[in-house]
Amino acid sequence: MDLLTLAKNVAQRVEAQATQAKVPVAVCVVDVHGNVVLQHRMPGAPLFSLELSERKAYTSALVRLRTADLVPLVQPGQALYPLIMVSGGRYSAMGGGVSLAREGEVVAGVGVSGGRRSRISTSSKRQ
């Protein structure tokens, strides 16, 4: 499956979950270099959620971690604190970003923004 097809499948699953939860979101899928493959904002999702979803996807693709797992690592004095400080806002350490792996290798990053963390899942899946 090519990356665009994978991105469309992921976006459809995210939107279905968000629709069921009645929480409009934005979703972004990027390749391993951080280039946008797909962006989608559901009607009613906050306008800023599109940008945040891209930052979350970018971070997950390049750092290869869930963005929620970065939170303790980017605090002052911690190992990845400089990453956030010098990135010009490009990286995100808020929940909602995951990397996608195929055959053990990261192929994309996915970011979801606009929903409440407890409602919309961004589980990493092997494709």
Predicted features, each with a name:
Residues M1-Q127:
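Flexible, solvent-exposed loop/hinge segments and secondary-structure transition points
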